[in-house]
From Swiss-Prot:
Species whose genome carries this gene: Mus musculus
Name under which the protein is recorded: G protein-regulated inducer of neurite outgrowth 1
Disulfide bonding pattern of the chain: none
Residues covalently joined to lipid (S-palmitoyl cysteine): 923-924
Region Interaction with GNAO1, residue ranges: 821-932
Record field: compositional bias (Polar residues): 257-281, 343-353, 408-423, 545-561, 583-593, 642-660
Quaternary state and interactors: Interacts with activated forms of GNAI1, GNAO1 and GNAZ.
PTM comment text: Palmitoylation on Cys-923 and/or Cys-924 is required for membrane targeting.
Region (Disordered) location: 1-149, 178-808, 866-908
Amino acid sequence: MRDCCSSPKAIPAPPRHALDQSLGMDPRHTSSSGAAEGASCSERPAGSLACPSPNCSPLPETPRAHGALTSDNSGTTLFGKPEPMSSAEATPTASEIRNPVFSGKMDGNSLKQADSTSTRKEEAGSLRNEESMLKGKAEPMIYGKGEPGTVGRVDCTASGAENSGSLGKVDMPCSSKVDIVSPGGDNAGSLRKVETISSGKMDPKTENVMHSRRERPGSTGEGDLVSLRENDMKPPDNTDSASTKKTDPEFSGKLTPGSSGKTELVSSVTVAPVTSENVNPVCSGGAGPAAVGNSETLSSVKKDPQLLGKKEAVSSGEGGSVSVRMAETVSARQPEGMFPAKTDSTSSNSTGPSGRADPVSLRNSELVSPVKPERLSSGQAERVSLVKTETLSSGKEDPRSSRRVDHTTVTGNMQTSQKGNPESSGKTDLGSSSSGDTRSLGTWGSLSAAKAEVTEGKGDPQPWKKASLPASEKTDPLASSKAGSASQGKAETVSPGEVDAMTLGKTVPTSSGKTALVSPGKVDLMTSERAEGIPELQASEKGNPVNSTRVDTGATGSTEPKSGVKVITQIPGATSPGKVETPSLQKEQPQLSEKTDPSRKVDPPTTVEPVSLGKADSASPSPRKAESQTSAKTVPQAPDKATSSLRQSDGTPYSSAQPQRDTRSIGSLPEREPSASTSQKDLAAAAAQKSPSAEAAAPPPGPRTRDNFTKAPSWDAGAPPPREDAGTQAGAQACVSVAVSPMSPQDGAGGPAFSFQAAPRAPSPAPRPPSRRDAGLQVSLGAAETRSVATGPMTPQAAAPPAVPPVFPEVRVRPGSVLAAALAPQEATEPVRDVSWDEKGMTWEVYGASMEVEVLGMAIQKHLERQIEEHGRQGAPAPAPPPAVRAGPGRAGSVRTAPAEGAAKRPPGLFRALLQSVRRPRCCSRAGPTAE
């Protein structure tokens, strides 16, 4: 890789030279210059490295490229180098396309923008350019770029866009650069590093990365991605270089950013690679580039005061870097000013966690940073974090900053995106994301960015809306769905790709990685293209910031994909979109394994969705289809996963929103994208999985259990309940049934239990009358039986029932007298029967507290009195009636009265004993017999 790097380095002279020219031109930002450079770039690209290529590419972006270059030359180098890599692929296209488009557009636009932005950044003239480039330019570039190739290219250039351009194809290179910058996954590491590197280091590293990337392009393969991811992951810093190298391979390059030492990074990277091409270019590229470029520039400028502080931080801490970078990027890009402080802080915050805190951060970040974050974010959750933070931080700023940044950053990107591309869109999404929104995201992201860009992010809403529509068209669908998913998953822009969402959902890192995968421009592309139209509304609808975030991811993924679609297609250069995606996915999938599988398979519902993305990507060779599928599917999946993640991380909202969006997107996409059979399949699979999962999971267990329990218990309860108290009976039976059912076949167990319960109750008419009589008392009865059942589910029931029935009959007989006929007797009788006569029942009552102790005691007393009277001990018929009458009015009254009479008739000790017995079941049972 280094060697490659060396080559680039060797070429460096030309590249740098070119850069210089480029820079010179950049400052001029002459379109012709850009064109020329583009030509030269092409020529240089002929040189493979033809750093000029980057320059060329960037030339249009030259400002951007310049920025990139400025970024440290790294940009150039990166740029150049990656470009070489990309260059061949992307550069020409990007160059031509980009240059023209961007050149004019970018130059003027970005230049101006850049200039103003850069102004602050001025410090880094290149920064300025770069930033401009990145920001104004790169984005525009990207925007203009709008072309896949261009995008790829633009990203590079624009992103300094290298990222963008690079992103797409250059992505690798650019990515490298950006990646280096951070754009990639390293985002954090890389970014940081890159940033640092970028600053000074970047050059080499960048170059390396570029080179690496370049070299790796082939490699880029997935391995790179993967390895990148891993490597990057591991050594973000190193990764920067190494990773970068690794990453270099096209995706790798991208990955690198993505690889970003972290998966997230990877994600980013991946995204960068896959998405990267798409997303990353935009997001990454844009954001990354912009951010990166910017960052780089920042990095470069790092030196910038603002950056400096930040940058230093950035440089200093890689995470810091990232953060800073991000922030810077954001800031810078944002307008540096905008976020800087905030970003910085945020970034910092983020960064720390950034890393991975990133998911959330990421999401935000991505959003915020989107452009950068995306890349960064994506790649780097950190960045994301940063971004996120920014977003968060931005929170407020968010709209402005974030959005602005996003816009701006994104905007640039977005524009680019818009124009440029899905990618941009994606990016924008990111930006948007920040702002967010699904709707926005994809949409606005695209649009907004493009437009709002766009402007600003200020116009966030507008941009969003605007962007939304366009973006929406483009990104939204996918973005929406995807973003939703992605967003959801992570919102993460990170996922920029889709995965992000998924991944995000899953893990930022993993997600990232995966996302990157999924994200991979492919899905995104597809989705983007596909979704674009469809989800537009969705995206629009989604336009929520939150959504944005979410969408962002999706959008990013999506958008990027869009861009990516093209880009990817071209970039596929590295690999065919389908292929690349697949590889990336596959590769990353391994890492993401869960995800991956799903990705490929889409089986895992959760994973599937995101994976779906991946899968769709993989499966559907046609990115678009896959994308659609993925998109559709991913969204769902991502939602699931993401939802979980999001819910947890992000919170339900994302999830919720996402799901809806996703669903919608999905529905939409699938329908609209039927073209992609894969998508449909994926969707179907996803749906099936999802539904099935839900159905199977919830229904099977629930239904079976419920049916079994409910059925057995219900039936049991049904028959007995009438006889006894519904509440008690139900509880008892249910308990019994449940206990029995679970263990024994529910049917068998349930049946027996029923039989027992039913038999006891059926045999004794008492139960039925009790139901007629006092519900409370009856409950006691039922409870007693039930308890019996519970105690001795099978045998005890039989035994208990016999005991109970006798008691009941006795009670009945006794109450059967005139007193029994009376209402009071009914109430009292039942309770008394259960309580006094049925020891178990009584115990149950007491312990179960089915009835209040006092009530039971009174009932018992009454019952005893009646019995006594009946027996004739002291019982004169006269006394009995009064109790009945009194009882009628109320148990309490009757009881009290009865006791008085009873006392007169009988020894007070008996009553006392009864009362005590109530409290002491055993005594009570003794008392009863004694009383009699």
